[in-house]
Amino acid sequence: MPVSHASSAETVAPGASRVSVLLPLPLAGPYDYRTDGATGLTRGDFVIVPLGTRQVVGVVWGEGTGDVVESKLRDIVAPVDAPPLPPVLCRFVEWVANYTLSPPGAVLRMAMSVPAALDPPRPIPAWRLADDLPAQLRVTPERQRIIELLRDGPARPASELAREAGVGLGVVKALAAAGALVAVALPPPAAFDLPDADRAGPTLNPPQSTAAMELARKVASGGFTVTALDGVTGAGKTEVYFEAIAAALQGGRQALVLLPEIALGAQWLDRFAARFGARPAQWHSDLTAAERRVAWRAVARGEARVIVGARSALFLPYPELGVIVVDEEHDAAYKQEDGVIYQARDMAVVRARLTDIPIVLVSATPSLETVQNVAGGRYAALHLPDRHGGAQLPIVTAVDLRADRPPRQSWLSPILRKALGDTLAAGEQALLFLNRRGYAPLTLCRACGHRLQCPRCTAWLVEHRLVGKLQCHHCGFQVPFPGACPSCKAEGMLAACGPGVERLTEEVTALLPAARTAVMTSDTITGPLAATELIRRVQDHEVDLLIGTQMIAKGHHFPMLTLVGVVDADLGLHGGDLRAAERTYQLLHQVAGRAGRADRPGRVLLQTYEPKHPVMQALVAGDRERFLASEADDRQSVGMPPFGRLAALILSGPDADAVDNIARTLARAAPHGDGIEILGPAPAPLAILRRRHRRRFLLKCRRDIAPQPLLRHWLGPVKLPASVRLQVDVDPYSFL
């Protein structure tokens, strides 16, 4: 079982006259406030305190520092009647703040993202039968049914009484007015049904059973461990880690499951309900404010036993957390790129260590970081070598576009066109993958050559023909598609260059007019309900051909889908991203894994101009280990992660000269020494974003050198003008 982490720093001495309070604001640290000493405050308690002319809710962080003289202290207004933040969450907030060089209050804000959850839950008005009915009470048959219901059962709300008795609401009100009913307040019902850990699950094959028993053993034993659960697509990894969740529930603990795209988790939720007889609590940005309030409070009170959520679910106040599962641990969506910049997979490992519980990292394409941690003995590994139920892995073929060229102004090669026709003729389903939203990535004028660019960024505007707009995918700027060139004013001369999913859909509709097509992108799937409905249509074979971006790679199971066509397998292979090859391999492997997941064999066609690229060869040969070994050698030879450490600095401001001046100041003060290298300053690849000029530094250091002390010493003395922002990204994943 998890051990207690209580320490003197987590308590407030009885009778203390001052306490430090951390506010959920991007401030340097806690502020001292006066307390009467009799309130009995402890670390993690919520309190209302004055800040300037307003009142805010903060968290007691410990005893006061004494840095402020007594005469200048302000009084705590009142404690808040809400479950306190658990001590381990307070330490987690501090750890994340120190690691990411973020203000502690900014991290605390993620743990207090639902202020309304701190309000006490509203009781439900109800009625019970009076102990003595009025002597003159006139009892009609309708009234008698109400009386009998309450005589034999508990108090009920008026609407429930009326419904069960088959009478109008006025009958209940009349009985109350006559003194036959007494008003009472009922506590709110449980927000979530309890999962049944002992409910029979699906039959596991021997490798699954072995892995499930090992995970369940670790959860039952407690203590911090990290296990990488690795297996081919369709191996049944989800059913394996469900047994780890069951072990946590049987031990009276909560379980947290992180998913990269919780809005696409409809199939996952169905599988969970089939195993445990109830649905878990959910936590993601598509919840309403009321749903978030209910979920936060249910987690804090221990009423929500299993929580599935996006990366921010890490910061919920679990009082009894027993296991963490990070599904699709390789997914780039776990990196938060704004506000407090953090990698949720890595922070989940930290949270598990601080809580002293096991964590499971799950993927068919584990990240190189996880692979190296397994190789170094820091993580344990469990492997599922085969698809569940006897399904075979698909046959992957690289289509050389240099030899098998698509027709002019088309994007599908003759081989892929024929495969699509044959698949649909056989009554099976196909999937076309192109990781590019919109109609075309570039629009140019055939008269003057002008390229339509975002006025706020150094990025091309993307045509979205379905809505008749040009959009910037970086800042959100959009404008109606012009009838004439903005530069030379020539009409009808704007041409689309390159394909997006909308243009691909247009081609497929012309090629296969009878096919029932559907598109799955962030433009067409606007929330969980839309995703659930589309997945249902594909499962029920109401769709013949599914076209989409990376959303379609996220673990979906479509038994009749036997063909996957990757329209541009080279997309994302090149550029300044050190993980470009790894990410491309992971994404294409996951997409390929949608084919042939049942009893029909699957086939994958990768359209590429580089069939000899190591990524393509690894996918065709099914040789992941060789690719990862080659990728590791390349990174290690230049000291790049996971064999070295990186931290990115991004300066930005509306005036390029002001940004450049600060960049030169930072360059002169840059740290140096053995194992330390500073790259930059240089214009960022995305040199202007939202009208702000951007300059980048990259701090590169040996694996045994922590970048945070270097960054604090380097950046501490620098005074930024109000117009210039400095963003620090420890362990960067984006290099734009």
Residue ranges and their predicted role:
Residues G265-R275, L444-R456, R503-R516:
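Conserved helicase motor "Helicase C" RecA-like lobe of SF1/SF2 P-loop NTPases
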Residues P26-A28, S285-A290, R301-A304, D338, ...:
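Cys/His-rich Zn2+-binding cysteine-cluster or related metal-binding knuckle/ribbon modules and their
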Residues M1-S363, T370, A375-A391, L424-A425, ...:
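Accessory, non-ATPase domains that flank or precede helicase/AAA+ motor cores in DNA-metabolism machines
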Residues R109-R138, G449-Q453, L511-R516, G527-L546, ...:
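Accessory helical-bundle/CTD segments and flexible terminal tails appended to RecA-like ATPase motors
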Residues A38, T53-Q55, T65-V68, E261-G265, ...:
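Conserved nucleotide-binding/hydrolysis micro-motifs of P-loop NTPases
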Residues Q471-P559:
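Long, charge-rich boundary regions
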